[in-house]
Amino acid sequence: MSDRFVIWAPSMHNEPAAKCGYCHGNKGGNMDQLFALDSWAHRYMNKMDVVKIENCTIGSFVEHMDVATYDRMCNMGFRRSGKFLYKVDPLRNCCRLYTIRTAPQELNMTKELKKCISRFATRITSEDYCPAAVASSDFVGKIVNAEMNSKTFYTRFEPALYSEEKYHLFVKYQEKVHQDYNNSPKSFKRFLCDTPFGPEAVLGTQESWEQLNNWQRMKPGEKLKHMGPVHECYYYEGKLIAITVSDILPSGISSVYFIWDPDYSKWSLGKLSALRDLAIIQRTNLQYYYLGYYIEDCPKMNYKANYGAEVLDVCHSKYIPLKPIQDMISRGKLFVIGEEETKVTKELYLVDSETGRGEGFPTDNVVKYKNIAEEIYGVGGCAFKSANESALELKELYGIPYEEEDLDTIYHLKEHNGHAPNGIPNVVPGLLPLWELLDIMQSGKITDLEGRLFLFEIETEGIRPLINFYSEPPNVKKRICDVIRLFGFETCMKAVILYSEQM
């Protein structure tokens, strides 16, 4: 069962945009930026008093998954908060959140970043320290040389577990930097310690921690032994001054959170931590640095572009360099890459191969690409008609309780009396389209889940394999389809779905 993906049935969580931690429902007078596409803004800009702009998240609590599975999930647009695995609905959400990643060789060492490293080296080394000769562009060498010659600064990788020392720094940071006074040991553990990974990934081995804590000495080609969540604690003159919370994945390091002591604000610890993570990635022979989400119209999130980056096109499950598409996503808009001559008639086929996700988009001639998001997901887009047709067939032929959804349910008009979606909507960019789900039914591929997928009903406390999809109750069929749409068919084959008849 070590590779099983044990999850609660997925659900959609909507709350007013005012509760969004990024825009707070206010785009500084540019209210059209609350909409994913211009056609939706034009449709509703004069009806803002009846439109419900929301913060829309789709996800699932995960009881267990392996690190390799989470690596794939990151390359599908997911992030985790403790045990909650989620992604946003980029069509309905008030902000467009794009998975962003970079690599050491992509970093543009600006004057500001060079100063950050230089000041750091000066602070942690003695006056008689003579830096080893390294190329001016070798930021990794400069960081490594300074740290290995410091008698006052060091870091320590350790399991992502609670300690009073870490918690006290967390509270100080939250209160002084974010004016957040609603903290507790329980919330700290839930956010920064709880994980869906097994004990072998959380606790590691003495050998794996020793190797990680000597990352500066790793040889080219040497394989990193530890994969899983970590806390890297920064110490200066014996005092804990910062904590990097990360997940080390087969393809790279995923940044979860960074905590720093406000008394050391002049150190630019946020910039330093990103530079150090990139240095660690290079020396440990990993590939990518996942910086979380990028939001083009949010200063708290768009600084990530400074590290050289590519963002995920969730409809292709592929990455594309950020610079060539910045005009496409300006003013908080949704993008889906397509070739100039491409004419789309339905949502794009979503790659369902575990090996096909997370690759770079072919960008030999980026100029030939255009944004086809309007053609698919705009007011006159092809996605909705196609999805409604598939929804009716899925219901009539296979007893899966999908319903038609009309356009005015997209932004939940306050006075609208038509059918509103129940649960995960029919059309969500980055989820398996309903026409593709219908193909799975019509081809008989759905039977590949039988004997492989397991179901656990909370009321009966009984676990059972799926024996015959077609004979399952409608609500169970729908839950299975939600998992397929959200996480992919191949992942569903190794899933255990926990569900309650009361939910």
UniProtKB/Swiss-Prot annotation:
Main localization (coarse): cytoplasm
Keyword Acyltransferase included in the entry's annotation: yes
Reaction catalysis annotation: an N-terminal L-alpha-aminoacyl-[protein] + L-arginyl-tRNA(Arg) = an N-terminal L-arginyl-L-aminoacyl-[protein] + tRNA(Arg) + H(+)
Keywords: Acyltransferase, Cytoplasm, Transferase, Ubl conjugation pathway
Lineage top rank: taxon: Eukaryota
Signal sequence interval, chain numbering: none
GO biological process, one term: proteasomal protein catabolic process
InterPro entries (alphabetical): Acyl_CoA_acyltransferase, N-end_Aminoacyl_Trfase, N-end_Aminoacyl_Trfase_C, N-end_Aminoacyl_Trfase_N
An example Gene Ontology CC term for this record: cytoplasm
Cell compartments where the protein resides: Cytoplasm
GO molecular-function term, one example from the UniProt record: arginyl-tRNA--protein transferase activity
UniProt-listed Enzyme Commission number(s): 2.3.2.8
Protein's job: Involved in the post-translational conjugation of arginine to the N-terminal aspartate or glutamate of a protein. This arginylation is required for degradation of the protein via the ubiquitin pathway. Does not arginylate cysteine residues.
Other remarks on this protein: Present with 2030 molecules/cell in log phase SD medium.
Family per similarity comment: Belongs to the R-transferase family.
Protein name, as recorded: Arginyl-tRNA--protein transferase 1
